[in-house]
A protein has these predicted regions:
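Active-site cofactor/cluster-binding pocket
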Residues: 1-254
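Thiamine diphosphate
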Residues: 10-98, 245, 250, 258, ...
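Short glycine-rich or small-residue beta-strand-to-loop segments that form or flank ligand, phosphate
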Residues: 11-18, 168-170, 258-261, 308-311, ...
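Short gly/pro/ser/thr-enriched loop/turn and capping motifs at secondary-structure boundaries
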Residues: 48-52, 111-115, 145, 292-294, ...
Length: 610
């Protein structure tokens, strides 16, 4: 049948179903196909913490939201244009995110009485009960159609049913005029060792596409044209993958081999897994028995001359705190990547937050200041990791890089850079010295000490957690301790001399300055433009460098009457700013729900104080 093709600037699709319905893969494949087609994209995987949550329950719903556009896309979108609900629980959990004009695709085979009741409905009519009967509802027997498509495939019934996500993906590909070839290529690569599965998956994908083209419920299809991008080679990249590659780039630029000692933890494990793939680039990885062993092996590797890395999330950062103090007092280069998740304790492992900031800044015994930087988007994780490595090695100090589950698991198009565009990394390595070696003698500008590797004659020195003097001799002298504490703090403070100036986006004479840090950038930036479109005078100051702050921070704040600090915690950055720059007043907008901001929340918060 004929369908009207409508051009649109952008569209948001939300796939949701049981944890075993393959929604993460479905969303990823749609995002990858759109990225390869040339669209701007932003993704938001949202899944339960349980390995297999209870079947058919709201708590067990797994979702994946994709925002594609022909222009700039900075968030996964607040509300969706298309909602795919593979069962009643998925519809119940996600109907609130469907726009009034949304299309809702329902697998009618799963909407039986038992599953409707299990999802907590009061009636047997979920659509009416949820008040979405005025949406464009596409009732499709997806499970039955999948079985029919693959009845001659030779696969067992359980394996066939698992393919219903591919049928659904085919329907969505038709609705948005996505080419099938990219996904065909993925299937050929994924099932290279199981070739019998390639053609059945291709067939069910095509049959879903063909089915959608022949039903009256889909009256229109949509085209999102490729975005206008700078010339170059692009790929879709997740935050965790970008972090790993940025660390490898820092290793290459410094000439120091990369060593990563880590313990698997959600949502940071993918960084260790990605690094382990690249042994051909001189990367060494160790999956340690626990968090403490992971960081301690990394410190040992740093002492031996490696660019040392350890990765973790909030609970692991707590366990690593004593060893972080060891890295700080020995003044060895180390990058600790904390992919933040909901806490405290185990918390909600698969949900995102920014609640580790205070721990990163202060969570150690003694006077133990550590440099803290943050990534603001999945692709920016590359630059953030690269510069964290540069600062760690050039200034001989541990650096904490804060990312978030939202960034680590999320993805967006990334223009693959040329390493010629990145600065050299020049660690203060010493091969020989005249006279007695002073391991804690400092560069007069940066206050960094020299990096002396074991085995160099005349450069032997002690390291360890006990206080030392400049000569590296253990000392409990009060005056020496005060001197060393002050020098280590001064070294971190002087890092500000090497940071770029903080930038402000928006009106210089704005009524409100929105302040954020880390992974909230896309939502704050989009909110800024929506407010400007309303005629409001607003500006955005988003921080990638936390400790130390950029040197011009106070000059920026002095220009604005109202400063609104927005963050996914109870106000940790606002409290830090009050301590560092108490001459200014700070308003707050906070969210601690294990979910990222939605743009409307920020717009409403700013309008409330204008």
């Amino acid at each position: 049948m004929q369908h009207k093709v409508i051009d649109t600037q952008d569209v948001v699709i939300r796939f949701c179903g049981d944890s075993g319905d393959g929604m993460q893969l479905t969303g990823t494949l749609f995002a990858d196909a759109s990225a390869l087609y040339g669209n701007e994209i932003s993704t938001f995987p949202d899944y339960p913490a349980e390995i297999r949550a209870p079947h058919g329950t709201v708590s067990g719903v797994s979702g994946f939201q994709v925002h594609i556009g022909s222009g700039e896309v900075n968030t996964p979108g607040d509300f969706c244009d298309v909602l795919v609900a593979m069962n009643p629980a998925a519809l119940r959990a996600n109907a609130k995110w469907a726009k009034p004009t949304a299309t809702v695709i329902i697998d009618t085979d799963t909407f039986d009485e038992a599953l409707i009741k299990r999802a907590g409905y009061a009636t047997l009519d979920p659509v009416t009960e949820l008040g979405i009967e005025d949406r464009n509802i596409i009732y499709s027997p997806i499970t039955t159609l999948t079985k029919e498509s693959l009845k001659d495939s030779g696969m067992d019934q359980k394996a066939i049913v698992r393919c219903k996500n591919m049928f659904t993906l085919g329907m969505c590909f038709f609705m948005f005029n996505r080419p099938l070839e990219y996904t065909y290529a993925y299937l050929e690569k994924k099932f290279k060792k199981k070739p019998a599965l390639i053609e059945p998956n291709k067939k069910v994908l095509f049959d879903g596409f063909n089915y959608a083209s022949n039903i009256q419920a889909i009256a229109n299809t949509y085209t999102v044209k490729p975005a206008k991008q700078e010339k170059g080679v692009y790929r879709n990249i997740s935050g965790n993958q970008a972090t790993a590659w940025g660390l490898i780039a820092a290793s290459e630029k410094s000439g120091r081999p990369l060593f990563c000692g880590s313990y698997p933890i959600t949502p940071a494990t993918a960084i260790l897994e990605e690094l382990a793939i690249h042994k051909n680039l001189g990367v060494k990885t160790l999956q340690a028995e626990d968090e403490i062993a992971g960081i301690c092996t990394a410190i040992g590797a740093a002492y031996a001359g490696n660019f040392a890395v350890t990765t973790t999330s909030g609970p692991g950062l707590s366990l690593k705190s004593e060893a972080l103090g060891l890295a700080m007092i020995t003044e060895l280069p180390l990058v600790l990547v904390d992919v933040q998740r909901s806490g405290p304790s185990t918390g909600i492992p698969t949900k995102t937050e920014q609640t580790d900031l205070a721990q990163a800044l202060y969570g150690r015994n003694g006077e133990c200041p550590i440099a803290v930087v943050a990534a603001h988007s999945p692709s920016h994780c590359f630059d953030a990791a690269f510069y964290a490595g540069k600062y760690a090695m050039e200034h001989m100090m541990p650096v904490i890089l804060l990312t978030e589950g939202f960034l680590g698991n999320g993805s967006e198009p990334w223009k693959i850079p040329s390493m010629k565009d990145y600065p050299a990394i020049k660690p203060p390595i010493i091969d020989k010295c005249e006279g007695a070696f002073q391991p804690f003698a400092r560069d007069p500008k940066s206050f960094a000490r020299k990096w002396a590797f074991p085995g160099k004659a005349g450069l032997e020195h002690r390291v360890g957690g006990l206080e030392k003097n400049t000569a590296g001799v253990i000392s409990s002298d009060p005056e020496n301790h005060a001197k060393m504490v002050a020098e280590r703090a001064e070294k971190v403070a002087r890092l500000a001399n090497y940071l770029p100036e903080q930038e402000v986006i928006g009106d210089k004479d704005a009524d409100v300055l929105i302040v954020g840090w880390g992974g909230t950038f896309g939502h704050l930036y989009t909110a800024l433009h929506e407010l400007q479109d309303e005629g409001k005078k607003v500006a955005l100051c988003h921080f990638d460098f936390i400790n130390p702050l950029p040197k011009n921070t106070a000059d920026i704040f002095a220009r604005y009457k109202k400063i609104l600090v927005c963050e996914l915690n109870s106000g940790q950055f606002a409290d830090y700013l009050r301590a560092k720059l108490p001459q200014f007043s700070y308003l707050q907008y906070n969210k601690v729900q294990g979910q990222p901001f939605i743009v409307k929340e920020i717009v409403d918060a700013v309008n409330a104080i204008l």
